[in-house]
Amino acid sequence: MKGLKNQIMKKTSLFICTLLFILSIVFYPKITFAYPFWAQQNYESPREATGKIVCANCHLAQMPTIAEVPQSVGADSVFKAVVKIPYKNDLKEIGADGSEVPLQVGAVVMLPDGFKLAPQERWTEEIKEETEGVYFTNYSEEKENIIIVGPLPGDTNKEIVFPVLSPDPSTNKEYHYGKYSLHIGGNRGRGQVYPTGDKSNNVVFTSSTSGTIDSIDIIEDGSYKVNIENDNGEITTEEVPVGPQLIVKAQDKINAGDPLTNDPNVGGFGQLDAEVVLQSPYRVIGLIAFFIGVGLTQILLVLKKKQVEKVQAAEGI
């Protein structure tokens, strides 16, 4: 009965996530492309064969991500994997409509096979408090070991706690005690490139040709059309969306690849690997027994030494 209930809850959560994704695509198509769940629709795995997490394909700027994972954990135990996504307080970025908006953050944690998001009934009160307002999603039904979060308001979520449940090799022979690797990614801010390959408005716009800027047209929505005349008298028009600020003016001479705008991006993506040891209880017991044995041996050696010293003293040596 409990298994059936968990299955129903899992399918309900997946349905809600899918529904939210579809609605966001319909009503906010350009905004949603910056969010972690877009990777779910385009990549079977969020990590490429090269080791790169696919979020870096859209979030081109690099910024640090920090992870805190315990060195070792017991079987069938709940532990915290903490992802820290640092950036300056009160930092604003350019939204899809060109206005300044607070940064949002997201994270992905790729756990080893067998590890997964801990069920809520096993969360401690501390974990419940630390994860309040955070919604965790499995990358897919088949990949319970890959968990994504976001977008979340960055000012209150620079540190995201992932409650993780370790496997129990004593009940499932597919898993073994030993050292395992985790792959972790953290992002702050919008991407620079959409999955379609088009630029967002959160990137530097450059000239595709050399020449002289003939004129700059300002469009009603605040975007620009920069008309560039080359040496042959041909006009090339570069479209700049609302958001980035122009750093050129009419009659400026430019070369292909020169920037037309500033760089509005203040965010970035970072990834790292971490390790955790799934500790066997028998190994712990053996280690304790070893230390006890070493301690007893040292005590016996000290006692033996004192005994020898007494004998030598009695014999006048």
Swiss-Prot record:
The chain crosses the membrane at residues 284-304. Residues 1-34 form the signal peptide. One of its GO terms (molecular function) is iron ion binding. Its cofactor is heme. Binds 1 heme group covalently. InterPro entries: Cyt-f_TM (IPR024058), Cyt_f (IPR002325), Cyt_f_lg_dom (IPR024094), Cyt_f_lg_dom_sf (IPR036826), Rudment_hybrid_motif (IPR011054). It is found in: Cellular thylakoid membrane. It is a single-pass membrane protein. One of its GO terms (cellular component) is plasma membrane-derived thylakoid membrane. Keywords: Electron transport, Heme, Iron, Membrane, Metal-binding, Photosynthesis, Signal, Thylakoid, Transmembrane, Transmembrane helix, Transport. The keyword Oxidoreductase does not apply. Heme binds at Y35, C55, C58, H59. It comes from the Bacteria. One of its GO terms (biological process) is photosynthesis. Belongs to the cytochrome f family. Component of the cytochrome b6-f complex, which mediates electron transfer between photosystem II (PSII) and photosystem I (PSI), cyclic electron flow around PSI, and state transitions. The 4 large subunits of the cytochrome b6-f complex are cytochrome b6, subunit IV (17 kDa polypeptide, PetD), cytochrome f and the Rieske protein, while the 4 small subunits are PetG, PetL, PetM and PetN. The complex functions as a dimer. PANTHER family: CYTOCHROME F (PTHR33288:SF10), PTHR33288. HAMAP family: Cytb6_f_cytF. This is Cytochrome f. It comes from Prochlorococcus marinus (strain MIT 9215). The gene is petA.
